[in-house]
């Protein structure tokens, strides 16, 4: 059995979080983030980084909550990563990059806004996957902003092809990109 099969089997065993549990975990991660940010803003040393026993406990609980949120949502990462297969990176690399996006989502999630975490995380995971593909999938790296422009150009060309039935001219493409 391969390590990918083992990994996929392992993440399938973890329970999804209920909406209430998501909110609880999100609040704990936020509390931890406030304490860690306080220390980082102070330059990583000094009194701001000297945590009380209660604060150390909050950080530990926050780390556990963060790990639980990540573990419970790895299926979402795999699902999205599979959609990006065949575009220049191996599935395991895509899963790794998607997990980085998921981690960012856990850190930035604000449960007070009332959104489900998976809805919020979806964007961050896709962002991580798209960023990885644009920076790692080519022999010559193209900057992300240029890659985004290429994507818009391809989309405009495809839409014009569907409308007209023939390849668009350069002028037609330029005009359609102005309106995007």
Model-predicted segments: where are they?
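Conserved small/polar residues in nucleotide/adenosyl-binding loops
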Residues: 178-180
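Alpha-helical residues within the helix-turn-helix
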Residues: 175
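Alpha-helical promoter-recognition and RNA polymerase-docking modules of transcription initiation factors
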Residues: 1-141, 148-163, 172
């Amino acid at each position: 059995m391969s390590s990918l099969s083992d990994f996929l089997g392992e993440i399938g065993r973890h329970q999804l979080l209920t909406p209430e549990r998501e909110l609880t975990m999100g609040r704990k991660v936020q509390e931890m983030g406030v304490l860690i940010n306080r220390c980082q803003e102070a330059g990583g040393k000094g009194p701001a980084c000297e945590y009380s026993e209660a604060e150390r406990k909050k950080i530990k609980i926050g780390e556990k909550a963060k790990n639980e949120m990540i573990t419970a949502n790895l299926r979402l990462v795999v699902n999205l990563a599979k959609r990006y297969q065949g575009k220049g990176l191996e599935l395991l690399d895509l899963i790794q990059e998607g997990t980085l996006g998921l981690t960012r989502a856990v850190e930035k999630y604000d449960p007070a806004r009332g959104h489900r975490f998976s809805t919020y995380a979806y964007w961050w995971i896709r962002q991580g996957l798209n960023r990885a593909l644009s920076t790692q999938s080519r022999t010559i790296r193209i900057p992300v902003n240029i890659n985004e422009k290429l994507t818009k150009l391809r989309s405009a060309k495809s839409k014009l092809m569907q409308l007209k039935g023939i390849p668009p001219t350069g002028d037609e493409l330029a005009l359609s990109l102005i309106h995007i």
